Amino acid sequence: MVRPSKTANVLQRVRECLNLGRYYDTSHASERKALRNITLPHVLYVLKNGCHEKKKDEFKPEYNDWTYAIRGRTIDGRDIRIAVAFDEKNMLIITAIEIKGSQR
């Protein structure tokens, strides 16, 4: 199977999906957010205002697709990384993690 190309402008695509309401949590993201006390408003704020961490993007052979890392600070100052992927029209929120210390 041929590896698909990465999405060219990840932040633009993320923000388009947010503006159109075309995003949803995977079950993994819902579980991890609850465990880590990360709320949907935290996630949305980081996705709207964060930066694309290209070095943290990963190809997932089991899905034959890429996940993209968006990182930023929440309004209350938490350093959060969100992993997202895209299907035809939507953005899937894969997971959310709080970064402690310097993991840039």
Question: Which ranges hold each PLM region?
Answer:
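Ribonuclease/tRNase effector modules and their secretory precursors
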Residues: 1-104
